[in-house]
Structures are given as C-alpha cells and as structure tokens.
Amino acid sequence: MNKYTINDITRASGGFAMLAVDQREAMRMMFAAAGAPAPVADSVLTDFKVNAAKTLSPYASAILVDQQFCYRQVVEQNAIAKSCAMIVAADEFIPGNGIPVDSVVIDRKINPLQIKQDGGKALKLLVLWRSDEDAQQRLDMVKEFNELCHSHGLVSIIEPVVRPPRRGDKFDREQAIIDAAKELGDSGADLYKVEMPLYGKGPQQELLSASQRLNDHINMPWVILSSGVDEKLFPRAVRVAMTAGASGFLAGRAVWASVVGLPDNELMLRDVCAPKLQQLGDIVDEMMAKRR
C-alpha cells in the first residue's frame, strides 16, 4: 500500500503553504454578510470553492476541501493543480446554540479508499476543545481518526480549536490554546493545525513568546490557521510562528475572505488572492531556509 507522509503536502523547502476552502455554514454567513442574495444557495459556495481551487492551487502545496460542497466537483473538474496535494475534511459539523459548528464528529460517510483513488493524500479533523468537556472523548476521537488515516496510508491532520466552556463565563483563550496543545500535541497525528496566539496582534516579542510556549507542547510538526487574524497581520504571524518552531500555515480567510461576494470572482481570486498566497509561500520558504 502506498503510504503518504507529510512530505507529500509540503513545498520543496519542507514548509507547508496550504489553502483551506472547507468552511461550510461559516462561509455561507460570510457571503450573506457581504450582501449576497439570501438565502445563499449551495451553488454559490460550490462555485467559489471550485474557482478558488482552480485559481489558487498552483500556489499552494496542498488544498483542503470539504465533502459537503466541493470535493466531488473539484475532482470531476480536475480543479487542483498537479503540484498541489488534496486534503479532505473528515469532520461533520453539528450546529447548535445559534452557531454553525457547536460540536464535531468524524464523518461516517467518508471513504478513505475512494479519496485516495481520487488523489487525496491527507484527511483533516476539527476538534473543538472546551475545558469542561471530557478530554478522553477527544483523545478517543483523535485516536480513531488517526487509525482511519494511517490504515489507508493517508496523512492525519488534527485541528484543535478552543471554545468557551459550556457552563460559566470564564474563558482564557490563550491558556486554552496551550491546554489543548498539552492534551493533543502528542496524540499520534502527523500534523497539528493551531490557532495563532493573541490573534496575531501586539508586539512581536509577545507573539513570539506565546508561540514558543505553544511549540513546547506540540510534539509533531505544526502549522497556523488564519481565522480571527487580520489578513494584514497574517504574514507576520507566519514568520513569528515559524521562528518559534511552526512549519507553515493551512489558511483560508487570510487569502480569500476579502473577495467573498465581489463580482468577477475568478478575476478577484487571480488578481487579489493569488499574490497573497504567493507571498505567504515565499515567507514559508524563507523561514525554512533559515533552519538549514
């Protein structure tokens, strides 16, 4: 059996410059907020995701797609550049309490064998981390996910995202990110996708210290995501995180959020988003070169 490794989703430099287009109801809300006619149709999301794959995948080492809106279309249309690996989201988002993703389970409809035949090299699992929910349940889910990936020769990517506790109102996001890393940073996955400390804001030294604390608890390669980070601050966030030990990024919003809902979608992706992704890839290569 052909077993993929993280080297199959990196750039030649060994760094990760990966694009996410697997946002689901959150993306629909972004289109609605941008003034798209309501209700925003599934086809609007699918078209945007497929166009993003076609236009931006040449500049990414991998692209993360979701089964619900675009995996099948991306495969059928050969939307992903040959130089770019495909990652498929293996998480099912369960809405509740007024938010699009209130809990997450492994998507039982996932077919790792088919994904591999379609050219997929990795699966991704979102793990919501709340201090007052059962740690063992999270660890068990990650273990099952890792086994699902590795038994089919696919790379396992976990994405712990912290949330306020179900009960009470005390929430220290920064401490929660560290606590999640302590719990899941040595859980047997191949890659850890993490929220940027401090939302990428503030003095560089503070960001670096926070990122180094995170690095101390993650016993696998790790990358940052861009949700919650101002897109103008994201290139610096990538530099700082990589200085602390990260190996790149897996991000969507910092690359394409600014063109959601604009006319001439393909043109916007090419003229506005592609240069951003290219620049981020250059930063990853530059930071990896410093490690040699």
Curated annotation (Swiss-Prot):
Entry keyword annotation includes Lyase: yes
Catalytic reaction(s) noted: 6-deoxy-6-sulfo-D-fructose 1-phosphate = (2S)-3-sulfolactaldehyde + dihydroxyacetone phosphate
Record GO terms (molecular function): 6-deoxy-6-sulfofructose-1-phosphate aldolase activity
Top enzyme class: lyase
Alphabetical list of SMART domains matching this protein: DeoC (SM01133)
EC number: 4.1.2.57
Domain of life, source organism: Bacteria
Listed InterPro entries: Aldolase_TIM, DeoC/FbaB/LacD_aldolase, LacD_aldolase, SFP_aldolase_YihT
Active-site residues annotated for this sequence: K193
Alphabetized UniProt keyword annotations: Carbohydrate metabolism, Lyase, Schiff base
Function: Cleaves 6-deoxy-6-sulfo-D-fructose 1-phosphate (SFP) to form dihydroxyacetone phosphate (DHAP) and 3-sulfolactaldehyde (SLA).
Record's subunit section: Homotetramer.
PANTHER family: SULFOFRUCTOSEPHOSPHATE ALDOLASE
Homology family: Belongs to the aldolase LacD family.
Stated name of the protein: Sulfofructosephosphate aldolase
Organism: Escherichia coli O157:H7
Lineage, broadest ranks: Bacteria, Pseudomonadati, Pseudomonadota, Gammaproteobacteria, Enterobacterales
Gene designation: yihT
